[in-house]
Protein backbone atom coordinates (compact mmCIF):
# COMPACT_ATOMS: atom_id res chain seq x y z
CA UNK A 1 0.00 0.00 0.00
CA UNK A 2 1.23 3.46 -0.86
CA UNK A 3 2.54 5.32 2.25
CA UNK A 4 0.18 8.26 1.72
CA UNK A 5 -2.80 5.91 1.45
CA UNK A 6 -1.64 3.95 4.48
CA UNK A 7 -1.40 7.18 6.51
CA UNK A 8 -5.14 7.68 6.09
CA UNK A 9 -5.73 4.63 8.27
CA UNK A 10 -3.15 5.36 10.98
CA UNK A 11 -5.81 6.29 13.54
CA UNK A 12 -8.67 4.16 12.27
CA UNK A 13 -9.68 2.92 15.73
CA UNK A 14 -9.76 6.45 17.14
CA UNK A 15 -11.73 7.58 14.10
CA UNK A 16 -14.26 4.78 14.62
CA UNK A 17 -14.59 5.64 18.31
CA UNK A 18 -15.05 9.33 17.52
CA UNK A 19 -17.65 8.50 14.85
CA UNK A 20 -19.57 6.33 17.32
CA UNK A 21 -19.71 9.20 19.78
CA UNK A 22 -20.68 11.60 16.99
CA UNK A 23 -23.61 9.27 16.24
CA UNK A 24 -24.69 9.44 19.88
CA UNK A 25 -24.21 13.21 20.01
CA UNK A 26 -26.25 13.81 16.85
CA UNK A 27 -29.10 11.64 18.15
CA UNK A 28 -28.91 13.48 21.50
CA UNK A 29 -28.98 16.91 19.83
CA UNK A 30 -31.96 16.12 17.61
CA UNK A 31 -33.83 14.25 20.34
CA UNK A 32 -34.13 17.41 22.41
CA UNK A 33 -34.28 19.89 19.53
CA UNK A 34 -36.92 18.06 17.53
CA UNK A 35 -38.58 16.74 20.67
CA UNK A 36 -39.30 20.27 21.85
CA UNK A 37 -40.85 21.19 18.50
CA UNK A 38 -42.93 18.00 18.51
CA UNK A 39 -44.13 18.69 22.07
CA UNK A 40 -45.25 22.19 21.12
CA UNK A 41 -47.37 20.89 18.25
CA UNK A 42 -48.82 18.05 20.34
CA UNK A 43 -49.79 20.45 23.13
CA UNK A 44 -51.64 22.73 20.70
CA UNK A 45 -53.53 19.73 19.32
CA UNK A 46 -54.38 18.15 22.70
CA UNK A 47 -55.46 21.35 24.45
CA UNK A 48 -58.02 22.27 21.82
CA UNK A 49 -56.86 25.86 22.14
CA UNK A 50 -56.06 27.99 19.10
CA UNK A 51 -52.47 27.41 17.98
CA UNK A 52 -49.83 29.83 19.18
CA UNK A 53 -49.21 32.91 17.10
CA UNK A 54 -46.62 32.78 14.37
CA UNK A 55 -44.07 34.80 16.32
CA UNK A 56 -44.45 32.62 19.42
CA UNK A 57 -44.02 29.49 17.33
CA UNK A 58 -40.91 30.87 15.63
CA UNK A 59 -39.38 31.86 18.97
CA UNK A 60 -40.16 28.47 20.50
CA UNK A 61 -38.63 26.49 17.61
CA UNK A 62 -35.57 28.76 17.54
CA UNK A 63 -35.07 28.38 21.28
CA UNK A 64 -35.46 24.58 21.18
CA UNK A 65 -32.86 24.13 18.47
CA UNK A 66 -30.45 26.77 19.76
CA UNK A 67 -30.42 25.56 23.37
CA UNK A 68 -30.24 21.93 22.30
CA UNK A 69 -27.13 22.67 20.24
CA UNK A 70 -25.51 24.66 23.07
CA UNK A 71 -25.97 21.79 25.53
CA UNK A 72 -25.10 18.98 23.10
CA UNK A 73 -22.08 20.70 21.58
CA UNK A 74 -20.71 21.60 25.01
CA UNK A 75 -21.07 18.00 26.21
CA UNK A 76 -19.27 16.55 23.19
CA UNK A 77 -16.95 19.47 22.41
CA UNK A 78 -13.87 17.89 23.99
CA UNK A 79 -14.70 14.44 22.62
CA UNK A 80 -15.53 14.77 18.92
CA UNK A 81 -15.85 18.52 18.41
CA UNK A 82 -19.64 18.32 18.67
CA UNK A 83 -20.33 18.79 14.96
CA UNK A 84 -23.62 16.84 14.44
CA UNK A 85 -23.76 18.21 10.90
CA UNK A 86 -22.25 16.78 7.68
CA UNK A 87 -22.07 20.27 6.20
CA UNK A 88 -19.88 21.43 9.09
CA UNK A 89 -17.79 18.29 8.63
CA UNK A 90 -17.39 19.07 4.93
CA UNK A 91 -16.27 22.64 5.67
CA UNK A 92 -13.70 21.33 8.15
CA UNK A 93 -12.46 18.88 5.53
CA UNK A 94 -12.01 21.74 3.07
CA UNK A 95 -9.92 23.82 5.49
CA UNK A 96 -7.88 20.88 6.78
CA UNK A 97 -9.63 20.44 10.10
CA UNK A 98 -10.73 16.85 9.39
CA UNK A 99 -8.93 14.00 7.65
CA UNK A 100 -10.78 12.23 4.82
CA UNK A 101 -11.46 8.98 6.69
CA UNK A 102 -12.85 10.73 9.76
CA UNK A 103 -14.95 12.95 7.49
CA UNK A 104 -16.57 9.92 5.82
CA UNK A 105 -17.18 8.19 9.15
CA UNK A 106 -18.59 11.37 10.69
CA UNK A 107 -21.01 11.89 7.79
CA UNK A 108 -22.30 8.32 8.14
CA UNK A 109 -22.60 8.76 11.91
CA UNK A 110 -24.41 12.09 11.60
CA UNK A 111 -26.93 10.87 9.04
CA UNK A 112 -27.71 7.66 10.94
CA UNK A 113 -27.75 9.57 14.23
CA UNK A 114 -30.33 11.95 12.77
CA UNK A 115 -32.50 8.99 11.77
CA UNK A 116 -32.14 7.53 15.26
CA UNK A 117 -33.02 10.84 16.94
CA UNK A 118 -36.11 11.33 14.78
CA UNK A 119 -37.16 7.71 15.35
CA UNK A 120 -36.90 8.12 19.12
CA UNK A 121 -39.01 11.29 18.99
CA UNK A 122 -41.60 9.49 16.88
CA UNK A 123 -41.61 6.46 19.17
CA UNK A 124 -41.98 8.50 22.37
CA UNK A 125 -44.83 10.68 21.11
CA UNK A 126 -48.27 9.69 19.94
CA UNK A 127 -48.68 12.17 17.10
CA UNK A 128 -47.07 11.91 13.65
CA UNK A 129 -43.82 13.78 13.25
CA UNK A 130 -44.35 17.50 12.72
CA UNK A 131 -40.68 18.44 12.54
CA UNK A 132 -39.95 17.98 8.83
CA UNK A 133 -38.31 20.77 6.90
CA UNK A 134 -40.73 22.01 4.25
CA UNK A 135 -40.81 25.07 2.04
CA UNK A 136 -43.45 27.56 3.11
CA UNK A 137 -46.16 28.19 0.54
CA UNK A 138 -44.94 31.01 -1.66
CA UNK A 139 -41.26 30.15 -1.15
CA UNK A 140 -39.72 28.86 -4.38
CA UNK A 141 -37.08 26.16 -4.55
CA UNK A 142 -34.49 28.72 -5.66
CA UNK A 143 -35.30 30.96 -2.69
CA UNK A 144 -35.08 27.95 -0.41
CA UNK A 145 -31.66 27.01 -1.77
CA UNK A 146 -30.26 30.51 -1.26
CA UNK A 147 -31.78 30.91 2.20
CA UNK A 148 -30.28 27.58 3.27
CA UNK A 149 -26.97 28.52 1.66
CA UNK A 150 -26.62 31.78 3.57
CA UNK A 151 -27.70 30.49 6.97
CA UNK A 152 -25.47 27.42 6.58
CA UNK A 153 -22.55 29.69 5.68
CA UNK A 154 -23.19 31.71 8.84
CA UNK A 155 -23.22 28.55 10.96
CA UNK A 156 -20.07 27.23 9.26
CA UNK A 157 -18.27 30.51 9.83
CA UNK A 158 -19.22 30.53 13.51
CA UNK A 159 -17.75 27.03 13.93
CA UNK A 160 -14.56 27.88 12.05
CA UNK A 161 -13.95 31.22 13.78
CA UNK A 162 -14.99 30.19 17.30
CA UNK A 163 -13.95 26.53 17.50
CA UNK A 164 -11.44 25.76 14.74
CA UNK A 165 -9.52 29.00 15.37
CA UNK A 166 -7.83 28.64 18.75
CA UNK A 167 -8.05 31.58 21.15
CA UNK A 168 -9.02 32.21 24.75
CA UNK A 169 -12.75 32.13 23.97
CA UNK A 170 -12.55 28.72 22.23
CA UNK A 171 -13.82 26.74 25.29
CA UNK A 172 -17.02 28.81 25.09
CA UNK A 173 -17.49 28.22 21.35
CA UNK A 174 -20.65 26.09 21.85
CA UNK A 175 -22.45 29.15 23.23
CA UNK A 176 -21.63 31.30 20.22
CA UNK A 177 -22.45 28.50 17.80
CA UNK A 178 -25.78 27.82 19.51
CA UNK A 179 -26.66 31.51 19.40
CA UNK A 180 -25.83 31.55 15.69
CA UNK A 181 -28.22 28.64 15.14
CA UNK A 182 -30.86 30.50 17.17
CA UNK A 183 -30.45 33.68 15.10
CA UNK A 184 -30.58 31.79 11.81
CA UNK A 185 -33.80 30.08 12.90
CA UNK A 186 -35.38 33.44 13.68
CA UNK A 187 -34.83 34.43 10.07
CA UNK A 188 -35.39 31.22 8.12
CA UNK A 189 -37.66 28.90 10.09
CA UNK A 190 -40.79 30.39 8.52
CA UNK A 191 -39.53 30.02 4.95
CA UNK A 192 -37.60 26.71 4.92
CA UNK A 193 -37.71 25.31 8.44
CA UNK A 194 -34.07 26.43 8.86
CA UNK A 195 -32.27 23.14 8.39
CA UNK A 196 -28.71 24.37 7.63
CA UNK A 197 -27.89 20.70 8.24
CA UNK A 198 -28.66 17.98 5.71
CA UNK A 199 -28.80 15.39 8.50
CA UNK A 200 -31.42 17.39 10.41
CA UNK A 201 -33.64 17.38 7.30
CA UNK A 202 -32.80 13.79 6.34
CA UNK A 203 -33.58 12.04 9.64
CA UNK A 204 -37.23 13.12 10.03
CA UNK A 205 -37.77 12.72 6.27
CA UNK A 206 -36.72 9.06 6.44
CA UNK A 207 -39.07 8.36 9.36
CA UNK A 208 -41.95 10.25 7.68
CA UNK A 209 -41.48 8.83 4.19
CA UNK A 210 -40.09 11.99 2.57
CA UNK A 211 -43.24 14.16 2.59
CA UNK A 212 -41.45 17.18 1.05
CA UNK A 213 -41.09 16.70 -2.73
CA UNK A 214 -38.31 19.30 -2.83
CA UNK A 215 -36.18 17.61 -0.19
CA UNK A 216 -33.16 18.13 -2.45
CA UNK A 217 -33.17 21.80 -1.44
CA UNK A 218 -31.83 20.74 1.97
CA UNK A 219 -28.84 19.08 0.35
CA UNK A 220 -27.95 21.62 -2.30
CA UNK A 221 -28.39 24.74 -0.14
CA UNK A 222 -26.30 23.58 2.85
CA UNK A 223 -23.65 22.16 0.50
CA UNK A 224 -23.25 25.55 -1.16
CA UNK A 225 -23.25 27.17 2.28
CA UNK A 226 -20.34 24.95 3.31
CA UNK A 227 -18.38 26.09 0.27
CA UNK A 228 -19.23 29.75 0.92
CA UNK A 229 -18.36 29.67 4.62
CA UNK A 230 -15.13 27.73 4.11
CA UNK A 231 -14.12 30.00 1.23
CA UNK A 232 -14.66 33.14 3.28
CA UNK A 233 -12.69 31.66 6.18
CA UNK A 234 -9.84 30.66 3.84
CA UNK A 235 -9.73 34.22 2.48
CA UNK A 236 -9.51 35.66 5.99
CA UNK A 237 -6.69 33.27 6.86
CA UNK A 238 -4.81 33.96 3.63
CA UNK A 239 -4.79 37.71 4.27
CA UNK A 240 -3.93 37.23 7.97
CA UNK A 241 -7.06 38.76 9.43
CA UNK A 242 -5.47 38.98 12.91
CA UNK A 243 -3.27 41.85 11.70
CA UNK A 244 -6.38 44.01 11.26
CA UNK A 245 -7.08 44.05 14.98
CA UNK A 246 -4.02 42.80 16.87
CA UNK A 247 -4.28 41.74 20.52
CA UNK A 248 -8.08 41.49 20.28
CA UNK A 249 -8.09 38.01 21.83
CA UNK A 250 -5.53 38.73 24.56
CA UNK A 251 -6.37 38.98 28.25
CA UNK A 252 -3.29 41.09 29.06
CA UNK A 253 -4.61 44.21 30.80
CA UNK A 254 -1.64 46.18 29.49
CA UNK A 255 -3.15 45.94 26.01
CA UNK A 256 -6.25 47.81 27.20
CA UNK A 257 -6.85 51.43 26.14
CA UNK A 258 -5.01 53.99 28.28
CA UNK A 259 -6.68 56.27 30.85
CA UNK A 260 -9.10 58.43 28.80
CA UNK A 261 -8.75 61.41 31.17
CA UNK A 262 -4.96 61.29 31.00
CA UNK A 263 -5.14 60.90 27.22
CA UNK A 264 -7.43 63.93 26.94
CA UNK A 265 -5.13 65.97 29.18
CA UNK A 266 -2.07 64.93 27.16
CA UNK A 267 -3.82 65.81 23.90
CA UNK A 268 -4.81 69.24 25.24
CA UNK A 269 -1.25 69.91 26.44
CA UNK A 270 0.08 68.89 23.05
CA UNK A 271 -2.22 71.35 21.27
CA UNK A 272 -1.27 74.11 23.74
CA UNK A 273 2.45 73.44 23.27
CA UNK A 274 2.05 73.38 19.50
CA UNK A 275 0.19 76.70 19.65
CA UNK A 276 2.87 78.28 21.86
CA UNK A 277 5.60 77.01 19.57
CA UNK A 278 3.85 78.43 16.51
CA UNK A 279 3.46 81.78 18.30
CA UNK A 280 7.15 81.83 19.21
CA UNK A 281 8.11 80.87 15.69
CA UNK A 282 5.89 83.66 14.34
CA UNK A 283 7.47 86.27 16.63
CA UNK A 284 10.94 85.06 15.73
CA UNK A 285 10.09 85.27 12.05
CA UNK A 286 8.82 88.84 12.48
CA UNK A 287 11.99 89.88 14.33
CA UNK A 288 14.14 88.33 11.63
CA UNK A 289 12.07 90.14 9.01
CA UNK A 290 12.53 93.50 10.76
CA UNK A 291 16.28 92.94 11.10
CA UNK A 292 16.52 91.89 7.48
CA UNK A 293 14.65 95.03 6.38
CA UNK A 294 16.93 97.26 8.49
CA UNK A 295 20.05 95.58 7.15
CA UNK A 296 18.78 96.00 3.61
CA UNK A 297 18.16 99.74 4.14
CA UNK A 298 21.61 100.22 5.64
CA UNK A 299 23.15 98.35 2.76
CA UNK A 300 21.31 100.51 0.24
CA UNK A 301 22.39 103.74 1.98
CA UNK A 302 26.02 102.65 2.03
CA UNK A 303 25.83 101.70 -1.60
CA UNK A 304 24.40 105.13 -2.48
CA UNK A 305 27.24 106.96 -0.75
CA UNK A 306 29.81 104.79 -2.38
CA UNK A 307 28.45 105.28 -5.88
CA UNK A 308 27.97 109.13 -5.59
CA UNK A 309 30.37 111.20 -7.77
CA UNK A 310 30.34 115.07 -8.02
CA UNK A 311 29.64 116.76 -11.40
Curated annotation (Swiss-Prot):
Q: Does the keyword Transferase apply?
A: no
Topology of the protein relative to the lipid bilayer: Multi-pass membrane protein
Q: What is its main location?
A: membrane
Induction of the gene: Shows similar high expression levels when grown between 15 and 33.5 degrees Celsius but a 50% reduction below 15 degrees Celsius.
Give the residue ranges of motif NPA 1. Answer: 85-87
Q: Does the keyword section mention Repeat?
A: yes
Q: Where is the composition biased (Basic and acidic residues)?
A: 288-298
- Which regions face the Extracellular side of the membrane? 38-56, 100, 165-168, 237-311
Give the highest taxon in the source lineage: Eukaryota
Residues annotated as glycosylated are 300
**One of this protein's Pfam families, by short name?**
MIP
InterPro entries registered for this protein in UniProt: Aquaporin-like, Aquaporin_transptr, MIP
List the keywords (alphabetical). Glycoprotein, Membrane, Repeat, Transmembrane, Transmembrane helix, Transport
Q: Which reaction does it catalyse?
A: H2O(in) = H2O(out); NH4(+)(in) = NH4(+)(out)
Polar residues biased stretches: 299-311
**Domain topic, free-text comment:** Aquaporins contain two tandem repeats each containing three membrane-spanning domains and a pore-forming loop with the signature motif Asn-Pro-Ala (NPA). Lacbi1:392091 has NPN/NSA motifs which is in accordance with the fungal aquaporins (NPx and NxA).
Family matches, as PANTHER family? AQUAPORIN TRANSPORTER, MIP17260P
Record-given protein name? Aquaporin Lacbi1:392091
Q: Give the species this sequence originates from.
A: Laccaria bicolor (strain S238N-H82 / ATCC MYA-4686) (Bicoloured deceiver)
Lineage, top ranks: Eukaryota, Fungi, Dikarya, Basidiomycota, Agaricomycotina
Amino acid sequence: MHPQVASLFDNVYEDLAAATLEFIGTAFFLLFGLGGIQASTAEDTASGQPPASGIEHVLYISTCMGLSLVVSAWLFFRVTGGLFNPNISFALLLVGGLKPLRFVLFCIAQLTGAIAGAAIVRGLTSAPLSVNNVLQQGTSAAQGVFIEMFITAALVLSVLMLAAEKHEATPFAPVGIGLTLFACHLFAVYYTGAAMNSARAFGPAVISGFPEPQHWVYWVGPFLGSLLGAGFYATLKHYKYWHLNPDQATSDYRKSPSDPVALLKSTAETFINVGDEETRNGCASNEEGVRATGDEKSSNATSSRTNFSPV
